[in-house]
Swiss-Prot record:
Pfam families in UniProt: DUF188 (PF02639)
Name of the protein described by the UniProt record: UPF0178 protein TDE_2151
PANTHER family recorded: UPF0178 PROTEIN YAII (PTHR35146:SF1)
CDD domains: PIN_YqxD-like
Signal peptide region: none
The organism's place on the tree of life at top rank: Bacteria
HAMAP family (UniProt xref): UPF0178
Source organism: Treponema denticola (strain ATCC 35405 / DSM 14222 / CIP 103919 / JCM 8153 / KCTC 15104)
Family statement: Belongs to the UPF0178 family.
Length: 155
């Protein structure tokens, strides 16, 4: 299992928590972005071409079923969920086959509103509550994934 991070807009504290979890569980953590981003010790940084969606494409092409991805990008999350990855965002939301289409529809609707000048003001704060929610979800998801991998290897 590898942990993939869409690093273009990933907050520093989330990068730190993710790298620490990877180190603790001896899992590779790969940050991908179209520019150099400082990453914590022990993690890898892949700098892709400086083109739109290049980091997303890299993660999609190199990840495998059972890996974990962290991204805010809903279309990327959809691709990865469909591929069989565990996918979460930096606020502690998990994307699944059951809910990803709802998130994608909401995202597309908000883009339509924005294009027509009707979008509400963004009030998304990012603080201790969101960091704690992310950290808790990351820990529980990694434990679940590793337990499943252990069970699968016994048969």
């Amino acid at each position: 299992m590898k942990i993939w991070v869409d690093a273009d807009s990933c907050p520093v504290r989330i990068r730190q928590i993710t790298a620490k979890a990877g180190e603790r569980l001896k899992l590779p953590v790969i940050f991908a972005a179209n520019r150099e981003i400082p990453v914590p010790k022990g993690a890898s940084m892949v700098v892709t071409e400086n083109t739109e969606q290049a980091a997303d494409l890299y993660i999609t092409e190199n990840s495998v079923e059972g890996d974990l991805a962290i991204t805010r990008d809903i279309p990327l999350a959809k691709l990865l969920v469909d591929k069989g990855l565990y996918v979460i965002n930096d606020r502690g939301t998990i994307f699944t086959r059951d809910n990803i289409n709802t998130y994608l529809s909401a995202r597309n609707f908000m883009y339509e509103l924005q294009a027509n000048g009707l979008a509400p003001e963004k009030t998304n704060s990012f603080g201790k509550k969101e960091i704690q929610k992310f950290s808790n979800l990351l820990d529980s998801l990694l434990a679940k994934a590793l337990k499943q991998r252990h069970l699968d290897s016994r048969f």
